[in-house]
Amino acid sequence: MTNEYIPFLSKIKEIVKHTETEYTFRMTYVGEVRPGQFFEVSIPKYGEAPISVSGIGEDYVDLTIRKVGKVTGEIFELNEGSCFFMRGPYGNGFEKENYQGKELIVVAGGTGVSPVRGVISYFGEHPDEVKKLHTILGFKSPSD
């Protein structure tokens, strides 16, 4: 069993640049994780920041990060193949079974879309599992 309080080194598999200040980092990760959970990411000498999981794969997690401070600024300087520390996952996350057969309304904005992206994606791909899926998303500007 892994101790979620002990940081581990994770490698950047891929970087997707959405805007000048928002990137998605595909990080190596093997373990249980649910949409809505988050990791504490850290760069030694700069600190740590909580970042929500925006995507989950068999051997990775996606972290969509907005460049807003020292830690995220340093992460944005890294390249594919570079590493940073993570610990977690934390939070309860979203269990799809809680929403199956129901009308689902998802409201989110900005980088707050990241934690619910997995729920939207899953039920968007499996529409027969919910009565109806509504999404209301807000952003500062069209470029966001």
Predicted features along the sequence, with ranges:
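Ferredoxin-reductase
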Residues: T2-S82, F139-K140
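FNR/FR-type flavoprotein reductase catalytic core
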Residues: K70-D144
